[in-house]
Amino acid sequence: MPDSVDLSYAIGLKPAQAIEYFQSKGYTIGFNWHEVEVRAHATAFTVAGILRQDILQDVRAGLQDSLDNGLTLEQFRRQMTQKLTQKGWLADKAKLVADEDGVLEGKQLTPRRLRTIFETNMQSSYGAGRYAQQMENAADRPYWTRVAVMDLRTRPAHAALNGLTARYDDPIWQFAYPPDGWGCRCRVRARSQSDIDSKSISVWSSEGHLETVQQAWGPQDTREVQAFRYNGQLYTPDAGFGHNPGQGWLAGLGQRLMDRSVTAPPKMAALAVQHTLSEPQLLDAITSDMRRFVNQSLLREPAGAFRHAGALSTRTLDALASRGRMPDSAVLTVTDYAVVQSPGPLWELLPKQLRQPVAVAADGDDLLYVIRNGDALHQVRATPVDNAQGYALQLPDGGKSLTPASLQSLAELPLLEGSFDGL
């Protein structure tokens, strides 16, 4: 039988030391915690809602320090307040008018906003570990129960889901695995069949209860998102939190940041996406998620689902600006309609290849990317979307390899980035 542990001592340890401490007491860690820790660290600095490069770096450093050294919220906030005030990004709260999240005209931050960022991202970091552990143990504990804190801070919609129990492979966990909203403190408890039987717990299924709804997205836009009815009430995750987090926390956070980038100034969005996708763990997660999205899109009728694949580079934006064609949004998006029109393996390569294209040319308002797949070159067309929603990606000619004649035609277009020399 394992020895007793001193939780007051263990809670202040760094992750590696905490694991070693519990193992020394005879406890077996039933999941690959090294992998989970790496994912948690990668998750921690993918900060949604802060798209300015210098601030993103500061917040990343602060969150990393919090994970490494077990800093409290107050220590994190004090550290970030001093740093952001010095840079002129944090103003006197008494002199400003902020929205409910503390955001000031999209440019400045308040301590309340810092609290939201800290709690949401740390909760997501720990959620990555919980999810990995529960998936590895799904054969023994295949039933998941959603648990809310149930205090005065718990939102009624989240409190209403307290106790919801469904199988781990139920579709709702693809978009409603917590945290699924700003400030969400809910978690999931895994249960065995004997636990279900002994406690007479009812297992719910989302079959017949899933709906597609229009959700407000920014001040003047809406988008189709998934929702479900439970006990007669319709539940929808917060805007930006419905990107299949149950199958990839990092991919979900990456999609969330790019969602926010859609309405950000293009240069700011390009810097944020470029910086964030430089994290190998995140880029791999987004690539895997794109593969799943493509496979799922080919199994059903197109319904307007999409995945972001990246953003225009700052070099391309500068070239467009010099031509008087600065876009309203820099985000590049793959839709299920485009996948069905041109099925193939190229789609999953886009998150990586679009970051370092062979060349980018202008064709009117469209952009033509040339990317490499082994020894072959392929063309990707990016077409501006209405209402400043970035660019929709397509694979001309079904993604076939470019011929010498096709390359010659592309080389005659205005070059924005890269080179056609030697191709």
Predicted segments with their positions:
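Ribonuclease/tRNase effector modules and their secretory precursors
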Residues: 264-423
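Domain-core detector
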Residues: 1-181, 191-303, 347, 358-367, ...
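Extended alpha-helical oligomerization segments
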Residues: 185-189
